[in-house]
Amino acid sequence: MRITIFDTTLRDGSQSRNISFSVRDKIEIAKALDDFGVDYIELGWPGSNENDMQTFLEASKLRLKNAKMVAFGSTRRKGIKAEEDSNLNAILESKAKVACIFGKTWLHHVEMQLKVTPKENLEAIEDSIRFLKGKGFDVFYDLEHFFDGFKHDKKYALECLRVAANAGASCLVLCDTNGGCLPDEVRKIVSEVNEFMKKNKIKTELGIHMHNDSGFATANTFEAVKLGVAQLQLTVNGFVERSGNADLCLLIPALILI
C-alpha cells in the first residue's frame, strides 16, 4: 500500500486562531511543502473568499515537482443543480485539477443544518461529485462528521460512503470533525467500513482526517493506516482551529519507523 500525504495546513490550518495567511504566504508555504515531498496541497477554498481564489490563480503558475494543488468546497446547495452552484463553479475557475469536497454524513446535521431529507442529501453528494468528475477533476470526498454519524446511524453513514464511491470519488475520507474519537473506536469503525466495502465490492481508496479535541488525532490516524487507509490529511505542527489536526511532523517519522 502506498500512503499519500494530503497537507491541509493552508486550508484547515488557516482557520487557527491568530493565523491569517496572505496570498504570498500561501505560495511560499506551498513551494516548501512541495520541496518536502507531500503529494497533495489543499491550498484553500476558492468559493469562500477572493484571497483564496487569487492564491489558486497565482499557484497555477508554479512548476511543482511533487505535489498537486487541491481546491476545497462543499456539495451543492439545496434546491439548485450542481452546475448552478457558485461554490462548485469556483472550483472550476481555480485552475486546480483535484477537488476535495465535503458533505454531511450525520443525520442530525442533514435535518437540522441543511434542512433537507436524507435522500436529498444523498442526491446532493452524487450530483456534486458527478459534476466535477464530468469537468475532468479528480475528486476526493470528505465525509464530514463520519464517525459521529456512524455512531448515530451506521446505515446512513455507510450509504453516504457508497453513494460517493458510485458517483466516482477516487478517495473517501473519513472525518472525525469533532475530534472526539478514541483509538479503539477508530479501529472498530474503520474495520466495519472495510467489511462494508468488501461486501459491496467498493474498491475506492480510503482517507482519514482527524481533529485533536480528544488528544488522539495523530494516534487515530496511525490506527487507520494499520487498517489500510491510504490518504492521510494532516497539517504542519497540527495547526487548525480548536485543538488541532493530526500532526504531519509527528506522523511521518512514525510511519518511516514501522
Question: Which role does the model predict for each range below?
Answer:
Residues 1-258:
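Catalytic cores and adjacent flexible loops of soluble metabolic enzymes
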